């Protein structure tokens, strides 16, 4: 069975609308593409996410990345399953001032744990802004 036909962009957008907390919805994360174990999302510039210096705050970057990976994990599984973040670690490499391109990659899809890597690039310059490693538990 082709999992991408059963869990594509429309299903992922519905997932974001139905299971995330209200404040997560305010990130306005846009799904760009979904494929086997890799997904791309766009975090648009939003003044609600900006801190002093006119850059997107780190908390918003990690929240958007975590949310994007949750969608990627559900997509790889092929149907909705409860999961939770076990560990997430972020290295900020440069300020993100114009919005971000978030690229997720699942490194291991186990029966109980899922390990992933996320990179966040500046949407205008394509320069790497953050590198994130993460682990999720399948409940």
Task: Identify the meaning behind each predicted range.
Residues 1-139:
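Terminal targeting signals and extreme-terminal segments of soluble enzymes
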């Amino acid at each position: 069975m082709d999992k991408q036909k059963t869990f594509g962009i429309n299903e992922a957008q519905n997932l974001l609308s139905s299971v995330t907390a209200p404040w997560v919805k305010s990130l306005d994360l846009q799904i760009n593409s979904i494929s086997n174990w890799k997904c791309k999302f766009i975090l648009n510039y939003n003044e609600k996410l900006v801190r002093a210096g006119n850059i997107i705050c780190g908390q918003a970057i990690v929240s958007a990345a975590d949310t994007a990976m949750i969608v990627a994990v559900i997509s790889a599984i092929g149907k909705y399953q409860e999961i939770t973040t076990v560990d997430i670690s972020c290295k900020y490499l440069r300020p993100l001032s114009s919005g971000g391109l978030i690229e997720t990659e699942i490194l291991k899809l186990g029966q109980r744990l899922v390990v992933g890597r996320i990179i966040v690039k500046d949407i205008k310059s394509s320069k790497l802004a953050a590198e994130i490693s993460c682990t999720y538990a399948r409940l």
